[in-house]
């Protein structure tokens, strides 16, 4: 079941992000990797800046999260993570479809250039690499 996150979900969102972000260890630039990958303060700051999370719950346990943030002309997909033990079950797809369905603007997604699995995931869902003047570490996607 997909639902909007509530304040009570904060710790679970924090834990899912940091569990799933382990996949980036050794992949992203070393100066960008740290543990936890995202601190509570960073997560709180993103939420205060307008990231609205949706959660996928399985038997009342949140196993996947994905955020969307309104940025004038576009909506940004932010922090798309599924618990490591729950990957490859279609949860990310369901969350992405839900956010796309609710978007009224073009969607932009940024990910690490070296995260080829993430790039393939978004390409499978109709996104394409956008022409970019953004640093080579990350590549944006555009619907």
Q: Which positions does each model-derived feature cover?
A:
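Conserved GNAT-fold acetyl-CoA-binding loop/helix
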Residues: 18-43
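A short helix-loop-beta-strand connector motif used in the catalytic cores of GNAT acetyltransferases and
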Residues: 41-54
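Conserved acetyl-CoA-binding loop-helix of GNAT-fold acetyltransferases
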Residues: 82, 88-101, 124
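A short beta-loop-alpha structural element at the N-terminal edge
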Residues: 1-15
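A short, internal acetyl-CoA/4′-phosphopantetheine-binding micro-motif in the GNAT/acyltransferase core
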Residues: 80-87, 111-113
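Conserved active-site alpha-helix within GNAT-family acetyltransferase domains
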Residues: 93-94, 114-143
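Conserved GNAT acetyl-CoA-binding A-motif
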Residues: 102-114
């Amino acid at each position: 079941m997909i639902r909007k996150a509530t304040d009570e979900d904060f710790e679970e969102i924090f834990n899912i992000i940091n569990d799933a972000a382990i996949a980036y260890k050794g992949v992203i630039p070393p100066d960008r990797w740290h543990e936890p990958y995202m601190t509570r303060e960073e997560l709180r700051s993103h939420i205060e800046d307008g990231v609205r999370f949706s959660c996928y719950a399985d038997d009342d346990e949140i196993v996947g999260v994905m955020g969307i943030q309104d940025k004038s002309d576009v909506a940004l997909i932010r922090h798309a993570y599924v618990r490591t033990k729950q990957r490859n079950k279609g949860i990310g797809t369901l969350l992405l479809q839900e956010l796309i369905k609710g978007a009224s603007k073009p969607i932009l997604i940024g990910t690490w250039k070296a995260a080829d699995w993430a790039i393939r995931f978004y390409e499978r869902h109709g996104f394409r690499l956008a022409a970019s003047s953004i640093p080579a570490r990350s590549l944006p996607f555009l619907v």
